[in-house]
Amino acid sequence: MRSPAKTMPSMSPSSVSTEKSPPPSDTSMAIVAFDNSTTHFSSSPSPPHSLDHSSESEKEDAKSKPESRRNKNPGKVEETPSPIVVVHNHNRSVKEVVPTRKSARVGSGRSSGQRSGAVSAILRRSRREEVVKFSALGFRLSEVVLALISFSIMAADKTKGWSGDSFDRYKEYRFCLSVNVVAFVYSSFQACDLAYHLVKEKHLISHHLRPLFEFIIDQVLAYLLMSASTAAVTRVDDWVSNWGKDEFTEMASASIAMSFLAFLAFAFSSLISGYNLFNQGSL
């Protein structure tokens, strides 16, 4: 006997598809995962727009790196003494220009200081030379006056009468008179030369040996005046000790005193002559 066939319940196609098909959310996720894996391991070359985008991003990164490096230590730029320093390829040239300018300024200050020092030294030297010139002229005039008074008094030292006497009888008095006459002539010429030099800025007789000649003559006349005055004083003392004081001895003593003062004037003139000898350009 045949058993009756069992009839299966009929199902609509829509119901079958809904029961057996996976949920749509899972299917979308699987597709997304598959797509990502395929794109990740794909050996096909990337599209050109992606390369351009990557190269542009690399350029931007390369530009941003030095800027970030500069901004890491901003204090270093501020610590530099020169405000002109900029981080470029010509940074060395800028750094080299700044110290040269500073050194030029410092050098100009030193040069100006040296110029002012030289000017002040020249002014001091000119003033010293003027003082020396006027001092020399003053001593020369003193020599003229003192030598003139000395030999004038000695030449007039004469007495009349049976006990009369005269200076020309004693060699000491004659020696003193002669030395004072020579001193008067020499000092008169030197006084005229100094006065002419102060007015015209030149000497009556210009010679390279003139300072040496003046120094030697001043020294010689100073020693001669000293020796003549000493010899005349000895004769006066001998006369007074034997005969006592009178008009003759008093006039001789006055002449000797003027001669001694003339010696002092020549001594100072010899010092000035020595200064002029070792400073040829002063007078």
Curated annotation (Swiss-Prot):
Pfam families to which the protein is assigned, alphabetical: CASP_dom
Stretches assigned to the Cytoplasmic side: 1-135, 196-212, 273-283
Cellular compartments annotated: Cell membrane
Membrane topology: Multi-pass membrane protein
Alphabetized UniProt keyword annotations: Cell membrane, Membrane, Transmembrane, Transmembrane helix
Region span, Disordered: 1-86
Keyword Transmembrane found: yes
Membrane-spanning residues: 136-156, 175-195, 213-233, 252-272
Compositionally biased region (Low complexity): 9-20
GO cellular-component term (any): plasma membrane
Comp. bias intervals (Basic and acidic residues): 50-79
Superkingdom, natural source: Eukaryota
Stretches of the chain found on the membrane's Extracellular side: 157-174, 234-251
Subunit structure: Homodimer and heterodimers.
Family membership: Belongs to the Casparian strip membrane proteins (CASP) family.
Official protein name in the record: CASP-like protein 4A3
